[in-house]
């Protein structure tokens, strides 16, 4: 009990582990495989805080590298506790020993090793605070012989730090640029969500009548129903957002490192405004100006900086071209909404014919875009959604919209396959009263499917998981057919495997659907069973076998 209270005082909201004899003294929620345990708490909190990860030292810890690096680029505050070989045997090459600090040096913002059990509370304080201050994982390495020791220690006082609000001169200069702008545009990133700054962003955007584009895979950083919401930029994002931001003379990049995928050309549009003045706000000064030239850089919390800028805007800020800008925003959004609702298939590249051939051969099956339209008819407004890496999930980038933050979970720029399933498990653990829906292609799902036997247990909360089934590694097939004269190798998956049947064998519901109507109904029913009966459902969506998304470089 005292241990649990200690974690809570420090803001650790959930802790997950993979069972092992190095950590039998600590347990909260156990999974079946290392990557699953590490992905789960990365997204399990809805309120601001820090989640926890731990597993067996050595081979258990090596499974954490990909998920922890994913959390690093997703800017997730996370406590990583790594059991180490016993103090007396370190360096002797004993059972499951390796240099675990070196292993994570590039994947955490801070790391510290404990060599005396009396220092555990002090180090725990420091590591958690570093994770919170830097919005990133931080590592605490503890020799395994300390885990079962009982000692008397004084718990140090928790010392919290305020996040910075930006330099005075920089905030004033940003306010001046936005006050003078004729076509201001705001780009919202993960920092807006992590700092709870959406209300501040709304006030600033409305004061300027500035359209708001969202960073790639951060669709929940601005309310989708807002008249100024333009949708996500980047791969398969919002054409409306791309058309609008290319007209900007001033861009406020709020809470974002301007990752490359958020400025990637799409639909034949190289939209990043080359002559615009760029104001970049990021909690990490090292990332300001890293990918794009900036006019003003501000190190600070997105919410505090937004409030500071708003307070210093001139009385006429946003007035230049306000009426025309509002009209153009509305027209552009309407035109894109109509186009998106009628998009059914992907175009073939010159010299390839996979998509057109698939439409003829599999005329009775859905395309990915048709599936996404059917899905959005059944997703509850308050749902938390996770998406995996890969062709079918990426094609759906423009479809999900949200009215609140911490609702959209995505693999981010590290791009690990197998993220969608364990991340939605973690979301449900942290938010048991909220409907959750995970999405993954059949290739990506196969990487993490061993957690099906974990979530089938009675002590696990219920989820809904949608698996896009086109029996191929679609993104890789897309690239090989393009680069190698319409040829491919190693991209096909077993057509005799049924994930719906495996789900039923694991004690959960398994459903297979072929049409839009079946998909909408199955998803509606699955979410209802999740919330009313605490039942987990896996929906296997049969798709056209070879619809491949547009290329990215």
Model feature map: region roles:
Residues 1-12:
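Bacterial Sec-dependent N-terminal signal peptides
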Residues 51-320, 353, 378-381, 460-465, ...:
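N-terminal alpha/beta PP-like core and its mobile active-site loop of ThDP/TPP-dependent enzymes
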Residues 250, 384, 435-437:
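Structural motif
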Residues 155-171, 322-362:
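Long, charged amphipathic helices and adjacent flexible linkers at domain junctions
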Residues 81, 89-96, 291, 297-299, ...:
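Thiamine diphosphate
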Residues 335-431:
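Active-site diphosphate/adenylate-binding microenvironment
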Residues 17-25:
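C-terminal segment of classical bacterial N-terminal signal peptides
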Residues 28-47:
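N-terminal propeptides/low-complexity segments immediately following signal peptides
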């Amino acid at each position: 009990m005292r241990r649990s209270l200690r974690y809570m005082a420090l803001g650790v909201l959930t802790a997950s582990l993979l069972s092992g004899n190095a950590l039998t003294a600590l347990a909260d929620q156990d999974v079946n495989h290392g990557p699953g345990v590490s992905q789960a708490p990365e997204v399990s909190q809805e309120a601001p805080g820090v989640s926890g990860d731990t597993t067996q030292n050595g081979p258990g810890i090596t499974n954490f590298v990909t998920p922890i690096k994913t959390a690093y680029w997703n800017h997730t505050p996370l406590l990583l506790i790594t059991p180490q070989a016993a103090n007396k045997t370190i360096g002797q090459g004993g059972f499951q020993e390796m240099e675990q600090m070196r292993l994570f040096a590039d994947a955490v913002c801070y790391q510290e090793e404990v060599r005396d059990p009396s220092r555990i509370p002090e180090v725990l304080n420091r590591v958690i605070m570093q994770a919170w201050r830097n919005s990133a994982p931080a590592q605490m390495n503890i020799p395994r012989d300390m885990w079962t020791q009982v000692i008397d220690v004084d718990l140090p006082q928790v010392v919290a730090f305020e996040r910075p609000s930006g330099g005075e001169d920089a905030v004033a200069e940003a306010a001046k640029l936005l006050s003078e702008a004729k076509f201001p545009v705001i780009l919202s990133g993960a920092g807006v969500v992590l700092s709870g700054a959406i209300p501040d962003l709304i006030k600033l955007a409305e004061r300027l009548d500035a359209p708001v584009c969202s960073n790639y895979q951060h669709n929940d950083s601005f309310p989708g129903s807002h008249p100024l919401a333009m949708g996500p930029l980047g791969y398969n994002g919002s054409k409306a957002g791309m058309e609008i931001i290319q007209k900007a003379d001033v861009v406020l990049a709020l809470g974002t490192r301007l990752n490359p995928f958020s400025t990637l050309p799409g639909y034949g549009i190289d939209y990043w405004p080359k002559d615009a003045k760029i104001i970049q706000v990021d909690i990490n000064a090292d990332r300001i100006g890293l990918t794009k030239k900036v006019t003003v850089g501000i190190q600070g919390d997105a919410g505090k900086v937004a409030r500071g800028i708003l307070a210093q805007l001139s009385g006429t800020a946003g007035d230049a071209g306000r009426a025309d800008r509002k009209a153009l925003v509305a027209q552009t959004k309407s035109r894109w909404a109509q186009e998106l609702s009628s998009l059914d298939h992907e175009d073939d590249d010159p010299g390839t014919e996979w998509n057109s051939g698939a439409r003829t051969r599999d005329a009775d099956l859905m395309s990915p875009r048709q599936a996404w339209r059917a899905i959005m008819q059944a997703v509850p407004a308050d749902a938390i959604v996770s998406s995996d890496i890969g062709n079918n999930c990426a094609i759906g980038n423009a479809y999900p919209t949200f009215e609140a933050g911490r609702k959209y979970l995505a693999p981010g720029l590290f791009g690990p396959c197998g993220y969608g399933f364990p991340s939605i498990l973690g979301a449900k653990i942290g938010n048991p009263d909220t409907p959750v829906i995970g999405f993954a292609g059949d290739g990506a799902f196969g990487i993490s499917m061993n957690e099906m036997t974990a979530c089938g247990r009675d002590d696990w909360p219920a989820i809904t998981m949608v698996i896009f089934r086109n029996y191929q590694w679609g993104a890789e097939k897309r690239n090989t057919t393009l680069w190698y004269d319409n040829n491919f190798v190693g991209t096909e998956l077993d057509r005799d495997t049924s994930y719906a049947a495996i789900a039923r064998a694991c004690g959960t519901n398994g459903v297979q659907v072929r049409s839009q109507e079946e998909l909408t109904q199955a998803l509606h029913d699955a979410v209802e069973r999740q919330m009313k009966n605490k039942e987990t459902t896996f929906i296997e969506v049969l798709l056209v076998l070879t619809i491949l998304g547009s290329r990215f470089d």
